[in-house]
Amino acid sequence: MITREFDTIAAISTPLGEGAIGIVRLSGTDSFAIAQKIFKGKNLSEVESHTLNYGHIVDPQNQEILDEVMLGAMRSPKTFTREDIIEINTHGGIAVTNEILQLAIREGARMAEPGEFTKRAFLNGRVDLTQAEAVMDIIRAKTDKAMNNAVKQLDGSLSNLINNTRQEILNTLAQVEVNIDYPEYDDVEEMTTQLMREKTAEFEALLSNLLNTARRGKILREGISTAIIGRPNVGKSSLLNNLLREDKAIVTDIEGTTRDVIEEYVNIKGLPLKLIDTAGIRETDDLVEQIGVERSKKALQEADLVLLVLNASEPLTDQDRQLLEISKDSNRIVLLNKTDLEEKIELDLLPTDVIKISVLHNQNIDKIEERINQLFFENAGIVEQDATYLSNARHISLIEKALESLQAVNQGLEMGMPVDLLQVDMTRTWEILGEITGDAAPDELITQLFSQFCLGK
């Protein structure tokens, strides 16, 4: 009997809705046979692999033509899933793609589960878990640099690093075993306490360096969480609209117009900035506005960057001073808005690196972008050529656990424990790293990971 893992699956691989092209994908042993039942054109058993073939999709029960298509035929093992794959390129639209999918299912295919095509690629050894996760990162990437990082991971940058480290750990464990089982072998280097200490330090340094990339990787994947704060009606929402170059926030002269937190993404020199337009922080009796103010304070605490907007045409208020105080320890840029009006703000009470802007006239908005680039990218050295960045919370957690196991090895060495008794913690490190690539990942984890994928991927 064909198992559920290896029967023939089908799904629509393009977003539902109107479009130029829609793709219905099949993968499995019977892909060609099922497609032949509904495809009127060349004999698919005779076509060369990796070719596009013109024809029509026809309902075999009544010979009704559903659409004119180009059918992609790809034979295993040189496919994404390492199974036979058929991709029916049809005209985009909800009705036609659904009709073709239902035909394929009626003729023997099964509706694919979310992420099942990529899961099969993993189970068949085409990709490991880090590469499978990179597929989703590519789909979700908001900027070119985020996409490039995901592409490098798909190409095996993280896999190679983890696999090489696991191999070195395995070599160390094997050396300990040989010393125990065959002490008479003089040609095998003895794994002394000092040598084990050196090996452990080497592994720790490598994994620590990788872990240190997590902050930059998180920025690439999720964006810089940027809270725009200020008292009501200083121009926060107008600034958001200027940075986005479109109107997303309501702009009026009425205080308290923004009553909740508005989140939008903008591309700053190839990196994602998650802009959070907060409700003006002030004392208010309006219950709805109070909730917005509390959310603003929370956004301020969690932000990677704070843009504090002040009104340059008015003296500092108590609210301004409060905001300057509560944001002083943040990664902050102070912006003086309304500089097109007469300047009345006390400059001597402000940081020296304030940026003067006018959101009404779109003046110096580019200087904000330049400052952000300096703070996060140029000074921090983010996105070095060919660097590998940890951007996945699962990977980060497992690297931290692997380092804990190595620290346990070090503690044992400091206590004078024999090298052979430290194998357990060293082996645990090897196993944890295997969870990253999927070599030692439990089935429940694999199922959960792929369930997060979209249908048809």
UniProtKB/Swiss-Prot annotation:
Give this protein's Gene Ontology molecular function annotations: GTP binding; GTPase activity; metal ion binding
Positions binding (6S)-5-formyl-5,6,7,8-tetrahydrofolate in this chain are: R25, E87, R126, K457
Name any one Pfam family assigned in the record: MMR_HSR1
Keyword Cytoplasm in annotation? yes
Give the cofactor binding note.
Answer: Binds 1 potassium ion per subunit.
Which cofactors, by name? K(+)
Q: Which residues bind K(+)?
A: N233, T252, I254, T257
Q: Into which EC class is this enzyme placed?
A: hydrolase
GO BP of this protein: tRNA methylation; tRNA wobble uridine modification
User: What's its EC?
Assistant: 3.6.-.-
Where is this gene product found?
A: Cytoplasm
Q: Where does Mg(2+) bind?
A: S237, T258
Q: Name one GO cellular component term.
A: cytosol
- Residues annotated to bind GTP: 233-238, 252-258, 277-280
Write out the entry's keywords from A to Z: Cytoplasm, GTP-binding, Hydrolase, Magnesium, Metal-binding, Nucleotide-binding, Potassium, tRNA processing
Check the record and name the NCBIfam families matching this protein: mnmE_trmE_thdF (TIGR00450), PRK05291.1-3 (NF003661), small_GTP (TIGR00231)
Which function does this protein serve?
Answer: Exhibits a very high intrinsic GTPase hydrolysis rate. Involved in the addition of a carboxymethylaminomethyl (cmnm) group at the wobble position (U34) of certain tRNAs, forming tRNA-cmnm(5)s(2)U34.
In Swiss-Prot or TrEMBL terms, this protein is called tRNA modification GTPase MnmE
Q: What organism is listed for this UniProt entry? A: Streptococcus sanguinis (strain SK36)
In the UniProt record, the gene name given for this protein reads: mnmE
